[in-house]
Structures are given as structure tokens and as C-alpha cells.
Amino acid sequence: MVPEAGTNRGEFMRYYISDCHFFHGELNDKMDCRGFDSTEEMNAYMLKKWNAKVRPNDEVVILGDLSWGKPDETKELLNRLNGRLYLIIGNHDRFHENNAYRYDRFVWMKHYEELKDNKRKIILSHYPIMCYNGQYYRNEKGEEKTYMLYGHVHDTMDQ
């Protein structure tokens, strides 16, 4: 379980991110056209931005597709990323099948999770879920009480 931000370990931020696709050259060149001259330049830029924002004590919930890299490349990357990492496994996270990654760099690796964050229920999945647990719950002000966070969709839902 992911602890509530600001409890248990002192003050920290929790970030949610998806579809970084480290080491995915075609994503840079053809699919998302990220505009970097090389995959190495893309990786270096994302790593620099990540570590400029995320402190070592912060938590990062990754909603899948962290890395398209080989196991050794991904392991090196993981050791350079700041933060306590939680992984919702995506369809491109091939490295998760390698038991070498079931080590303390990830607090956990799962396909689905429900947690509390800032007094809200959060549903986590790499894929969008049309009807998710608690989606119709409202608080006394009529505001949503449950949020679905997902990745996978890079452009529009109809793709």
C-alpha cells in the first residue's frame, strides 16, 4: 500500500506519471515525434527533468511503460532515478518479467491498485477502465470521490 503523503516518513510529494518509454527510439522518431536527435539524448533529457523535480524521499507511481530498454539498461536507469518507485505494469514493461527487478528499487509492481491520496480514492491501471470501482461516488458537496488514473493512450481513446 502507498502511504498517505506527509505521513509515516515525514513530508514528501507523490507524483504520478505514465508512458515515459525510456529507450524507445521509434517513439521519439516516428510515433510521438519527440524531436530529439537520438534515443540517448531523449533518455538524458527525461532523466535530468525527473531528478530536477523528484527528491529522493518523494514517491513516484508509474502507470506503466517506463522502459523499452534491455534488462541491464533498465536496471542502470532505475538506479539513477530519484524517488521511491511504485510500478503499475504496462504492456511495454518487458523488464518486469525478469526477477532481477523484484528488488527494493520498486516498493511494489502490480497490474492494478486502489489507494487513498489526499482523501480521495484513486484507481490505478495502465489501461483506461470504462467502469471502475467507486466511479459514481460523490462527497457531500457532490464532488467525485474516486479518480481513475491511467496511461497507455497516447493520442485519442479511439485509436
What are these regions (language model features)?
Residues M1-F12:
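Short, Lys/Arg-enriched N-terminal segments with co-localized hydrophobic residues
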